[in-house]
């Protein structure tokens, strides 16, 4: 089944839901970065979250960056989404290993760390991107994303994220959802949603049973006249190109480019998001340098 994102609202307009299925997306990330299970789960959750956050943008060429810097062995985790929910990402230590938790699950919270900062950067086409920061709440990512919405954007939010890694270290299933209360929602609605969230349980448990995220959303909001407003495919999609790398080299300035031409026979630039390698020989660099004089 292909990955997809849906967005909907209850009939009374009090609850918004965004849900995304990301199994193929997270597996593609694992193949690119050769992540071990702990890193697969951590970056997979982050990609799932930022996909939903990016889809909120009204600016077609906008992007959302979600960065988590904790004190755990995984190091910094960075994920970026466009306005359609297509993502890319990387983390500092894809080979980090920790013992499983007592319940047998991967210890993502310890991998990220309990102390640190979650940063959200929204590029919405204005002069300066919007940046919001909060302290990490648990390092489990879903709780931290929910806290970001509450503390930084004042939107009561429930976030659920899940990545199930198979015995061969491939991604068996992945997905998540954001449930958000709109202004004017009655107080009793919170209790109902908390009950529904607890009753549905983990995202991966539902996906492993053969459900998809559309069905999970319908179960969460059963009897509340869920109206889907949007549904489309999403994917792991890097935006890098040789032309963009050339622009980055030129932006380093004439002095630095002249130094590279003098000291290096060739240089290689590796994309952090997809591991694509772009190689430039002296003639390539000299041509780039000449182009800056025009």
For each feature predicted by the language model, list its residue ranges.
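Cys/His-clustered metal-coordination modules, chiefly Zn-binding fingers
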Residues: 198-294
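Interaction interfaces in information-processing and related assembly proteins
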Residues: 1-230
């Amino acid at each position: 089944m292909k990955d997809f994102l849906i967005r909907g609202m209850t009939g009374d307009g009090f609850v918004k839901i965004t849900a995304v299925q990301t199994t193929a997306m997270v597996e593609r990330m694992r193949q690119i970065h050769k992540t071990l299970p702990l890193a697969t789960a951590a970056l997979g959750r982050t990609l799932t979250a930022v996909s939903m956050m990016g889809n909120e943008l009204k600016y077609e060429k906008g992007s959302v960056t979600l960065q988590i810097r904790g004190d755990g062995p995984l190091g910094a985790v960075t994920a970026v989404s466009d306005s359609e929910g297509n993502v890319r990402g990387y983390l500092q230590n894809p080979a980090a290993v920790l013992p499983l938790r007592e319940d047998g699950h991967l210890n993502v919270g310890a991998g990220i760390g309990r102390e640190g900062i979650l940063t959200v950067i929204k590029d919405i086409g204005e002069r300066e991107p919007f940046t919001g920061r909060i302290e990490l709440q648990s390092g489990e990512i879903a709780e931290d994303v929910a806290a970001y919405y509450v503390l930084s954007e004042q939107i009561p939010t429930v976030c659920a994220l899940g990545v199930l890694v198979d015995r061969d270290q491939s991604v068996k299933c992945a997905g998540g959802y954001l449930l958000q209360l709109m202004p004017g929602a009655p107080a009793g609605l919170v209790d109902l949603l908390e009950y529904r969230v607890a009753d549905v349980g983990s995202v991966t448990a539902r996906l492993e049973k053969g459900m998809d995220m559309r069905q999970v959303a319908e179960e969460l909001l059963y009897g509340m006249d869920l109206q889907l407003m949007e549904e489309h495919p999403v994917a792991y999609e890097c935006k890098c190109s040789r032309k963009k790398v050339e622009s980055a080299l030129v932006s380093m300035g004439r002095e630095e480019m002249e130094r590279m031409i003098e000291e290096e026979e060739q240089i290689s630039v590796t994309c952090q998001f997809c591991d694509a390698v772009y190689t430039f020989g002296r003639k390539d660099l000299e041509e780039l340098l000449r182009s800056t004089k025009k």
